[in-house]
Amino acid sequence: MRIILITGISGSGKSVALNALEDAGYYCVDNLPPRFLPQLASYLAEDGQDRLAVAIDARSSASLDEMPAMIRDLSRAHDVRVLFLNASTQSLIQRFSETRRRHPLSGSTSHDADVGLLNSLAEAIERERELVAGLAEFGHQIDTSNLRANVLRAWVKRFIEQKDSGLVLMFESFGFKRGVPLDADFVFDVRTLPNPYYDHELRPLTGLDKPVIDFLDALPVVHEMIDDIEKFLAKWLPHFRDDNRSYLTVAIGCTGGQHRSVFIAETLAARLAASANVIVRHRDAPVEAGESSKLVA
């Protein structure tokens, strides 16, 4: 059975991700106490189910301490993948304010003696970060701070389409003006390269469009940058693989995240596709098609 565990910070989009998995045919359970996960997996496997998705939050803090060992045990019999959703505190506060929802650890809703009474929203968010921090290393992290719901659904679809084993290498383009992705393991700044933005014909395009590709591909300095990043990753990827890392996110940043970073992320992904299971995502470029422009909430 393939088991997808969705965890992370409340308000970061776990419900959106779970709905996407339900649409993909997964048996979905929201806010399951972690201690019941092994029994649920066994029951569904006996019942013929081959895909399970479970969303877990920080309300059962005692059980969260047992999750790393539980994940290792489940992985012996099942294909277990962990999706860890994160977002900046500022984004989360704005989302809770807009939806008028109460954070699960704030005020009177927190009954866990280990958690205590958390009056401010910011305090509840930071406490939750501490409680779930141990799960982040087991999963593929996605920063949803500036992400729209339809884009998150598309990224979840790509996540579950990956091969069953091996290192997943994520190339993520972004714009520094919207902040560095929280999920990045490595960040490469390519703002020193010539910017197609200053060509009025190229400005509305992205690094996926042929005129922008031709512009950047003709510059030796661009290829020097790509070659250097590729050599660095080719050298160190085996070490991460030997360390049993399942996911590695390489963030490529330019000013707006539309031209240079997109082109370089795509080029690196093509070059390293034989070395790992590669995913590409473009956080800030308008290249993800979808029916909704609503931000993750």
UniProtKB/Swiss-Prot annotation:
The lineage of its organism: Bacteria, Pseudomonadati, Pseudomonadota, Betaproteobacteria, Burkholderiales. GO terms for molecular function: ATP binding; GTP binding. Pfam families: PapZ_C, RapZ-like_N. GTP binds at D57, A58, R59, S60. It comes from the Bacteria. Belongs to the RapZ-like family. Displays ATPase and GTPase activities. ATP binds at G8, I9, S10, G11, S12, G13, K14, S15. HAMAP family: RapZ_like. The keyword Ribosomal protein does not apply. Keywords: ATP-binding, GTP-binding, Nucleotide-binding. This is Nucleotide-binding protein Bxeno_A0336. InterPro entries: P-loop_NTPase, RapZ-like, RapZ-like_N, RapZ_C. Transmembrane segments: none annotated.
